[in-house]
Amino acid sequence: MAKYTKEAILQMAEEEDVEFIRLQFTDMFGTMKNMAITAGQLEKALNNQCVFDGSSFEGFVTIEEADMFLHPDLDTFAILPWRPQQGKVARLICDVYDREGNLYAKSSRTILQKVIFEAKAMGYEFEISPECEFFLFHTDEDGGATSVTHDKGGYLDLGPLDLGENARRDMVLTLEEMGIDVESSFHEVAAGQHELDFCPAAALRTADQLMTAKFAIRTIAKRHGLHATFMPKPKTGVHGSGLHLSFSLVQEGKDVFADKSDEYGLSKEAYYFMGGLMKHISGIAAITNPLVNSYKRLTPGYGAPIYVAWSAKNRSPLIRIPLTGDGIMAIELRCPDSAANPYLALAVCMAAGLDGIKQKIVPPSPVDRNISDLTEEERNAMQITLLPGSLGEAVAELKKDDFLCQVLGQEFVDGYINAKEEEWHEYLRQVSDWETEKYLYRI
């Protein structure tokens, strides 16, 4: 049941003195876009009459079919707390429609909605809890981003070591004011690194909340004279920033992943779900870890997974079964990072897990030892494989995975792969500072 009607939104906008509305949507690569309108145009927007040029976005449409429509999701109406309180600014997240009046198949929000519909057809609803990590750095005299921090804090430290504590508190309070429930917030391992953990929510709401959170975090950071970055590995020699995703599955109020008679408390559906994730993870990585820089995080020694395995407690594998305060069984995927488009990341992970349930894909046995301590022979015997080691490798794996290509749509995949291959080849052509320092004077 919808939370808001058109009439309710128009009334709220008038009562709250809203003068400006941002119609937001997300492009193929997870970048938030928006069209701004005045309150006088709000009724037109709510009647789905706002048009934009889709040909101006990479991977959308050609110039011959450029006109596209924004259809606001009424339940996403929210006032932006950091904007002026006289003449307020609100936002609506929108679905993208083509000129024929159809949901645009290459829109990432549409792709996620298709997977949600498939889950509902199987009788399932997802609850997802993300853990979003990011860095806060100082800005230069012109307000530009740097990679400098005077923060000396470590994991769970507090002030005065944690210099970002006030900014992080304001971020949490801002998100709460927008109706987003934050479970916890704290300083992470690296200097200047922070984490916000969100309460479980339905899949589409989770993706919307992640996009909103990134927008709000950057905005609040700027107000504190800081720059927030979700770059997976912004500095050499420190822990990178991830986006751990914990998936729960519900059917008619029942915890689908739970079975008290099992050694690990897991149902057969939970095992199959993990099996599906592990089967498709090499191609999934091109979506959940979408940057060249993503694979600088997925290296040994910094707490990020590089091995395809699962455990009920061990944090070194790709998947673990976390302890939850509410007793609901969850499956945590540890490889994604916050550079990912959340709509696409959730879509491919959910679809892969559902494929595992449908195909009854049984995962290998759990690994409760630190995988880095195992020999190659031991890993092979335990069926432990590696995640892709680069964006180029992950994109090649996505190309080969017919199931994921079907989930995303071949037209979308072709555009996405073309862009990511171009990004990878551009990187390969670069001569880095490391190479110059290593070789210039002695070769």
Where in the sequence are the language-model features?
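ATP/Mg2+-dependent ligation/transfer catalytic cores
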Residues: M1-S184, T206, L226, A381-I443
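A generic structural motif
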Residues: D27, Y97-L103, P160, P200-T206, ...
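Short, conserved phosphate-binding/catalytic loop or strand-edge motifs used
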Residues: C132, L136, E188-L196
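Active-site-proximal beta-alpha loop/turn segments in soluble metabolic enzymes
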Residues: V148-L158, A191-T206, K235-G240, E252-F257
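Gly/Pro-rich turn-and-neighbor structural signature
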Residues: T206-Q209, R218, G225-P234
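Catalytic-core signal marking the mid-to-C-terminal active-site face
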Residues: T212, T219-K222, L226-H227, Q251-I443
